[in-house]
Amino acid sequence: MTDQSQQFASDNYSGICPEAWAAMEKANHGHERAYGDDQWTARAADHFRKLFETDCEVFFAFNGTAANSLALSSLCQSYHSVICSETAHVETDECGAPEFFSNGSKLLTARSEGGKLTPASIREVALKRQDIHYPKPRVVTITQATEVGSVYRPDELKAISATCKELGLNLHMDGARFSNACAFLGCTPAELTWKAGIDVLCFGGTKNGMAVGEAILFFNRKLAEDFDYRCKQAGQLASKMRFLSAPWVGLLEDGAWLRHAAHANHCAQLLSSLVADIPGVELMFPVEANGVFLQMSEPALEALRNKGWRFYTFIGSGGARFMCSWDTEEARVRELAADIRAVMSA
């Protein structure tokens, strides 16, 4: 029998993966130094440097909103602006936190294509106005994978980076589902970040088997100056930091981070294939990560809810998002697909 609690509303619904749980259990033995001066935090940072093939600065925060907001605040001043997609999480789902932590840096939205920014859309916003009365663009933030499940290719990232360098803009990546992007493309983390010109990455673990704790990686180490103070001031310096960092050791040391992401991606592909031939169901975006976006009638969506399924519909009338997780059961995917077929034929 399948786990009936498994839902597709969010990959945050899932629990803690065995590797992260085991690492936390090991970290719970004995005493360790506080505030990040412990062996687990050092080991996690070293694992990141090895994985990304570079001597980056590594920090940890409790969640993605804090990670993104503090990272962006370190890249600009209050009179600057941050260019993002109109669907970016920092714009739509972080309750003004980027503006709050930067003391007022304004978010400027740019047109996206399939959820992705382009050099042209960045240039359009960055050069729209250059007078003293307008917040000066200083940062571009992109999401990998995007909020609609699309994935930036290395060449796309390099083109965006080149535009940023030309215009004097720092480049930040919201990597809440960075693992899923790596799994989809088969690229190394380095190829999708600093080798493509990314200055700072917020690497998400919560959506990939961790309980809490995102990593902030500064590839441009100059931008990390006093970042530890920002974390402390914002309440993001965990006193028992080892319980944020140890799960990363569990995920990174034997490749669990990539295996779990690949499984979630596979389940999304499975769902997409199972509903592809259902009349009245339309795939809104290509399935490249762990999300499936379907266009269905409102009565059909309501019928699905009445069957006990949970999902989000924030992407427009008739649009529904179904997210797969590191532990999603294929049988549960098939149950969802069968119910979608049933409500569409009713």
UniProtKB/Swiss-Prot annotation:
Pfam families, sorted: Beta_elim_lyase
Catalytic activity, as annotated: L-threonine = acetaldehyde + glycine; L-allo-threonine = acetaldehyde + glycine
MF GO annotations: L-allo-threonine aldolase activity
Modified residues (N6-(pyridoxal phosphate)lysine): 207
pH dependence: Optimum pH is 8.0-8.5.
Keyword Translocase: no
Lyase listed as a keyword: yes
GO biological process, one term: threonine catabolic process
EC numbers, comma separated: 4.1.2.48
CDD domains to which the protein is assigned, alphabetical: TA_like
Cofactor annotation: pyridoxal 5'-phosphate
Effect of mutating residue 207 to R: 1000-fold decrease in activity
Thermal activity characteristics from the UniProt entry: Optimum temperature is 25 degrees Celsius.
Keywords: Lyase, Pyridoxal phosphate
Superkingdom to which the source organism belongs: Bacteria
Family label: Belongs to the threonine aldolase family.
Function: Catalyzes the cleavage of L-allo-threonine and L-threonine to glycine and acetaldehyde. Can also act on L-erythro-phenylserine, L-threo-phenylserine, L-beta-3,4-methylenedioxyphenylserine and L-beta-3,4-dihydroxyphenylserine.
Subunit structure: Homotetramer.
Record's protein name: Low specificity L-threonine aldolase
Gene designation per UniProt: ltaE
